[in-house]
Amino acid sequence: MIVAADHHSEPVFSPTGRLFARLVDHPWLCLVVGALITVLAASGYRDPGWALRLLEQAGLAEAKDEPAQPRGPAGRGLGRINRGRGPAVGRGDAVLVVESPAIFTRAGAAALRQIVSRIESLDSVAGVTWLDQAPPLNVFGLPEPILPRGAATPSRFKVARDRAVEHPLVVGQLLSPDGRTLVMLVRFNWAYVDDEADVTDTLLATARSAAAEHPAVPLEMWLTGSVPLRLEWMRSRETNERTFQLIAYGLILALSALLFRGLSVVLVTAAAPVIGVLWTMGLIRCFGLQDNPFSHVILPILLSLVGFADSVHMMVDIRRGLAAGLTPREACHRGLATVGVACFLTMITTAIGMASLSLARHDAVRDFGWSCVIGVATTWVAVMAVLPLCCVTRWGRVLAKGAGREAIGGQLPRIQRGIDFTLRRPRVTSAVAIGLLAACGLVALRLQPDDRKATILPMGSPAQLALDRLDKTLGGLDVCSADIEWTDDSLTPPDVADIVTAVETVVAAEPLLGHPLSIRRLIDSLPGEGPVRERMALLDLLPPPLKQSLYDPDARSARVTFRVQDKGTVVYKPTFDRVDARLREIAARHPGVTIGLSGEPIWRWRDLYHVVMDLARSLGTAAIEILAVMVVAFRSLRLGLIAIVPNMLPLAAAAAWMVFTGQPLDIVSVCALTICLGIAVDDTIHFLSRYRFEMAQGIPRMDAIRQAFAEVGTGMIMTTIVLVVGFSSVLISDNRDHRAFAMLGVVTLSIALLCDLFCLPALVAVFDRDRSEPVGVLPTSPPPPEAAPIRARSLVES
């Protein structure tokens, strides 16, 4: 049975615990600190970046050069979309995909020309490139439209179709090989773009309106491209964020009220993380960190979950004291002295873990790490300041309602029996946990970084359907290139032709790279015979813009373009690796020549791979740093090592689940695992902190383990149930990233709770003991349900 301390003895609090407990006696200090942070946060909302500008003026920070972006809503956040883009054939701000079996008919040609005319009449459109504007490939340079004009016969259209599928600038660039799908490349005049509808809905509606005037021509149209894809993602993200945040927070509020048996208690508990998030979003604006893509969703979720977990642990302890007959001030004094220390440790460990992101090579990841450090510290201050203020006001009387009658608290004796089962077999339980960690870790090594455009789009959306259609008909939306540059003036045009031919041969040998285009194909399409190196002079017959897009002798550059499907980095990585290696071999045979790959898929292959690996390495670094902090905080290497298993097993199990279900390792999944690590560490620290406190009161080790669960078990279970329900609400989203984030949260947090309830006590029983102590020996009778309230009273009576 649990051994309670003498009612006339004073509990042993740590110096840090006694310091935190004094906050109850000085509520004015909480008000002053809260007011100062509020003023700073408000200044960030009012004048974003003012603190960063001061640091730059003082020489303590480097100014960041922001690239110019198109004006208006459509231009926000296009930096990543436009990476690696150059003036290459097949690229446009938007791509109108048109599918019809009647393209090469008189009625079809008239309908297409009217569609183009209507689109070009829009102020927001600077021009449209489509197959009828393909440059002529004849030695005289005479204009020769692909689609016949006037009263052309069906036989002329058949000849036109055969010529089109042989035209290197048409097939695979503007027209599918079967002649049923064409693309119109739309360029926008950003000076006249005032609303996102100007480059999406209005454009598509105009095209469909023109097509409706030709009912005899079957036409299907979709709009895709860099700008529509970005706007579709932004629209879906904003809609899903608002909808599912409201649903998730509503479920959390309702479930918390049910578990706490009182809405007022939930409002007090939720006030601290809400205030912490508001403070944080203002403070990061002071340093110009608000535009980070991770800070829009990931940061508020991380802070609200970690802050809510700490608030629940604090509130459960305070209400347990109230149920034992303590006054609100005494109960809060006790909670700050015990749970407050654990909350401080969780803040330190989470902040250090997030600070490891600052070692990454990419600005977005580094800035996200510093935002997290600011956020977790600010949220902890909110928890430590708001709850004491509430306890010394009228809210303190309300908190006692329903105390001791929480829904979870009544189930603790049943869960205790499961914990006792593992404590009677601690060696077996520990061996199983360590074995599972090793096995899941080995499986997790099979994860590979991946990224696809389609993952950011709602399933079945027009942009996503157009993307799939282009993959099947034209070999993909993205146009990449092998860029050839040289510094040696002695490199002659025939030499360039040989290099281009070698590069195109490498590209054409890869089945996943579609429709390569270079000066070699253009020359082969022109009349005449002979090797390409002997016919380079024919390039002067081509329109200068076309020639310069593939070969610019003044700039000493040439390129071979090709299309890439949206199959993901995992599928394309072997292809890109082979091509890159062979291009290096070609460059090595020609001194002064460099050959490199460019394009958005190439950026995802290289840079995004490094972003994900940065996050993954930071996750591992965070685990090591958290271990070091726990060793210092608990002054015990054994407890620090013990904490590795229950904290890393959920992550390893979630990663193994990703392998078995075919999920990729992307930015969303790594961020989800990082957040879950922070929450899992919180529960572990609360348990170990309480265990150390009970040991300091002179309680036997096995009794201290069981008493620690009686004290913090309610908070651990309650926070996990609430957060899992909140995450589960997002599983119905039509966005793949949101569903993946939510599912990882559900899986990881559920496993983390099981590890903290059943693995952690067994690990402590086996490894944190003297050699002379027996293992697996429990008291003959379980602790009574009222043990925790009795213990709460004994801690303050003297």
For each predicted feature, which ranges?
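Signature of alpha-helical transmembrane segments and their immediate interfacial
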Residues: 4-53, 389, 403-452, 465, ...
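Internal alpha-helical transmembrane segments of multipass membrane proteins
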Residues: 36, 238-271, 275-279, 348-356, ...
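Juxtamembrane segments of multi-pass membrane proteins
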Residues: 66-84, 417-544
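Hydrophobic transmembrane alpha-helices and their membrane-interface caps
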Residues: 265-314, 639-688, 728, 755
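Short helical (or helix-break) motifs at transmembrane helix termini and adjacent helical loops
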Residues: 302-323, 343-346, 350, 385, ...
